[in-house]
């Protein structure tokens, strides 16, 4: 018989989409059930990274957006008495071909020693460029932790 699942840290990658907000809800619920903490990582996508590098997108505006989303996620965790923290990661690099949202999520999971990952999978039809819907399959295939795709 296998040991019961033990969860200390739940990782929830987000991109600011409605789907990632729903993933935070699930992540907080799982963390509360297992008396675990939650870590929300805001993954910045390729289009935004290229815009920052070209000077078309303000790095400060991206930081503000990521911070506002993280604040909402952390407030939700606080309401559920779940310890929470957050970070931001670029999910793309023009100089490293192996850097993409899926690898960033798994690298973050390793760095924070996450036991469980909740990843948004379905993007809205109007948001075909959502960063995380492209990464979900990669995470599902290669994560060493249990993954809930929502």
Describe each region flagged by the PLM.
Residues 57-71:
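A short acidic, glycine-rich active-site loop
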Residues 23, 50-53, 96-99, 129-130:
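Short, well-ordered secondary-structure micro-motifs
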Residues 56-59, 103, 136:
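Short, hinge-like loop/turn segments at secondary-structure boundaries
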Residues 34, 80, 135, 142-144:
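Short, structured coil segments at secondary-structure junctions
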Residues 5-54:
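Small/aliphatic-rich secondary-structure junction motif
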